[in-house]
């Protein structure tokens, strides 16, 4: 490692401020030789201007890394001690004597005494106490704890001085015309479709007023054209208003005529009904063939309505109605193949899954463990069984005699006819409904 100082790598200074520093920077062979350029330069420098070189900005430790700085001497240490002690003594002497000796003051009894009197509100007796006030013990070297607040100047009651200025003068008509700026009117765009006067279009055009001192003169023909356009527009608006009014009156007239016509038709129909109500009905006027045709028409209409009603029913209801029409015995459980088995509430499985072991006796199935189905009886109970004609004592002749002599529907009303007994209650209800509909249509 190079032990040469850092300052030796730099060019030598032209002039050193102190001889000790200059001797430290100069090499031994060059000591005593002062450069001529430095002398001439120093002689040319004016008085009062310090001579600063680059060497002055280098720290002392970097100028010579092997330089030893001597420790302070005993005399310097003693001077610093005496100066510090004198400052602290000055601080302690400025404090009150009570702060420096609090214990002795308390023992000696120094302090201020005051008499404190109190009066009882109930007994109205006064008691006095003597209180001794002693200064609080404080550190003399502790900084002051009193917060210095900024002194705010009190508000002054002086009124605010008004700003005096001359009153505004009213502009004359000529000045207002000079300051008037016409509104910008485009000759190409008019999105809102406003009708703009020609005077405003000319006022914004600078070609007619190059000097800018007066309003451009408008030709009389332009004024006539503007007036003609306004008059034509007013006439067109008046015509549109008249046509709208005529159209409105015509519509009101048509509505009034329709109302009168409807009122007249209603009056005619009312008079016709009253006339027919007064005249007696002559049955001989009706032709027998007309009565037959009307009867056939009514029967055909009833048949079409019945077919329409049956087409809207479900399959089971349609089969039930067909069975009633044919006079067959139909129960609630089975209707021509549309079976609706009764549900067993405690069975929540399919018995077909448990009846696959029915053929256990068949040879060739030795892996079958059970000899019969498990829940076969429940499946048999769910099958349809007729409630009548069951038992060994019923033979074919007894069954036939019961079927021929049985009365299928009992009479609940003694005034009902035989035809009503042979029909079901549902069919009677539908026939009554159809009869009521025919009566309404005839009326």
Swiss-Prot record:
Composition bias, Polar residues: 18-30, 414-427
Region entry Disordered, spans: 1-37, 235-307, 402-443
An individual GO BP term: mRNA splicing, via spliceosome
Keyword Nucleus: yes
Coiled-coil zones: none
Key words of the record: mRNA processing, mRNA splicing, Nucleus, Spliceosome
Pfam families in UniProt: SKIP_SNW (PF02731)
Protein localization: Nucleus
Domain of life of the organism encoding this protein: Eukaryota
Record field: compositional bias (Basic and acidic residues): 235-283, 294-307, 430-443
GO cellular component: spliceosomal complex
Description of how the protein assembles with itself and partners: Associated with the spliceosome.
Family: Belongs to the SNW family.
Role: Involved in pre-mRNA splicing.
Name this polypeptide is given: Pre-mRNA-processing protein 45
Organism name: Eremothecium gossypii (strain ATCC 10895 / CBS 109.51 / FGSC 9923 / NRRL Y-1056)
The encoding gene: PRP45
